[in-house]
């Protein structure tokens, strides 16, 4: 099976459970949003996939090959993460040369071309770059590799608005030109909402949702009006959260819409991915059903 399969992964740090029996699949040929608040468990799982740390229980398969201590898998995956794994004293162009030696699929010309688009000075040492330009260097490497699975862990932290827009533009072009799986792990939901096809939402080490974005948004809606009417309409529905202001109330619902009662003053609106994310992960939010 061409996919990254997560099988019953559990990871604990002392008494803290970072991942709690997590199982799901990143299928080949899609753009995923791997969403969750800071500390939800995203980076821990990415580090397990990348073989940087080991799970306490469970395992990861990439194209039916076990990830743990298997060098063959490393040629299939590249993970761009927040962690600085690069020698600070090496110039960017020297890093490119080293990466070119380790990855047969690295396109040096493309890396230099992307560097120019971002105005990344390849003669600078890595440690001399600002936080934003260190991120740009790592993005450039990821976009210049022809591997089946590319994972971006919080890719736009430190980037200004223009650079973020350029990154998403290059990412979409890259996806259109080469068949691969792209996974964007982020808590910045609004920025990726129009890019991703599938969403995996993780919170407190558990997966709340794995769903096609379009299907998910079709089932999510809000009901607003006088609190009594809202409560009556939503009495048998899967309400994932509320907002209240005086006698007015907004209920956020997942599930099939039903007709409003005759003469009702309630309003039904679509719910965006950001609001869905907030309501599912805030204190007291219900799980997706």
What are these regions (language model features)?
Residues 36-41:
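Walker A (P-loop) phosphate-binding loop of ABC-type ATPase nucleotide-binding domains
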Residues 50:
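Helix-to-loop junction immediately C-terminal to a conserved catalytic motif
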Residues 58-73:
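Conserved ABC transporter NBD signature motif
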Residues 81-138:
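ABC-family P-loop ATPase nucleotide-binding domains
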Residues 150-154, 159:
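Catalytic Walker B motif of ABC-type/P-loop ATPase nucleotide-binding domains
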Residues 167-183, 187-253:
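ABC transporter nucleotide-binding domain
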Residues 241-289:
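C-terminal coupling/interaction segments
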